[in-house]
Amino acid sequence: MFRGFVLGAVLLLMAACSSRPPDESNYVSTIAEARAAKDSALRAATTPILAADRDKFLPLAYFPIDPAFAVPASFTENPPAARQRVEMQTSTHQPRQMERIGTLAFTLQGKLLRLAAYHEVGDSSDHLFVPFTDLTSGKETYQAGRYLDIARSPTGVYVVDFNEAYNPYCYYNPTYDCPYPPKENRLSVAITAGEKTAGK
């Protein structure tokens, strides 16, 4: 949906990991390998990062990998006939028509939290698009928020893994059109996991 380019394979691999609990024996190495692969992909000629900006952004900046930020979640899916259509504002002021697929509920830092999951109207991918902001937004992380892509689970077992949170393309290149997280996805905790802003 919002991946594109050769980064698609990297993010799909990470999203697939988000539908099952992490195996701590290889969890950290799996995340580290995916991050290295993304850095390599972003050095290609056809990525959002312009050649002149690659030294500024690469390698990408991350919080340390922390399995505590990979939390089990329940997913309440809205029936297709009852799915709300939402006009999501974007970085280029061209609203996106999104469909609210359902809600992920989980406990983190002792708080019960919820995130709405979406996909773009007409999109047939088997992933949940979860844009969010948190108490690090505009400080250690991109002020406009970060994204998660979570694979749909046939078993109903979901893991929200914030170690896989990534910046939208408009962070690297303002010509890209990126949806802004809705108000309902503003988390009241600091998500010190996933991608940061350069130099933080």
Segments from the language model and where they lie:
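C-terminal motif of bacterial Sec signal peptides marking the signal peptidase cleavage site
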Residues: 14-16
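Bacterial signal peptide processing site
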Residues: 18-20
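Mid-length scaffold segments of soluble, non-membrane domains
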Residues: 79-143
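Acidic, glycine-rich flexible loop segments
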Residues: 130-166
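Extended, aromatic/histidine-rich regions of cofactor-dependent oxidoreductases associated
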Residues: 138-140, 157, 165-200
